[in-house]
């Protein structure tokens, strides 16, 4: 809101993007995808908080970068807000864990732990405005993005002693 207030008050050109569940190589901080990949690489069991039915739409980092570049190039994006995500990459957290397990050739067991916080059950972006005004479309589907992300983590895994 602060950036848009400066736009309204002082004419400072701003644009806001609302990214939905961005993942990919170089990811820092938390996140289910990073946690699942690192857990499998460590040969540990996968841990899912809650029952795994939470629904998420995952957006590969390259698609987010494409959207950022588009808003920088379009003066008509000034003052606007866009949802950026991939509604074609919608899965439950449990299904995500199983996909990653399959793509990594793992047979890791899954452990469910109680959820100790309130979680949003479903996060799916409506990207119609970004499609219409920016001509933006996410290009990387979930399995392709996961494969690239897994490869990145594997390349950085320390060699066995």
Residue ranges of each PLM-predicted region?
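C-terminal substrate-binding subdomain of Rossmann-fold SDR/epimerase-dehydratase oxidoreductases
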Residues: 40-161
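A generic local structural motif
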Residues: 1, 33-34, 109-111
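Short switch/coupling loops within ABC ATPase nucleotide-binding domains
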Residues: 5, 21-22, 135
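Active-site Tyr-X1-5-Lys
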Residues: 1-15, 41-42
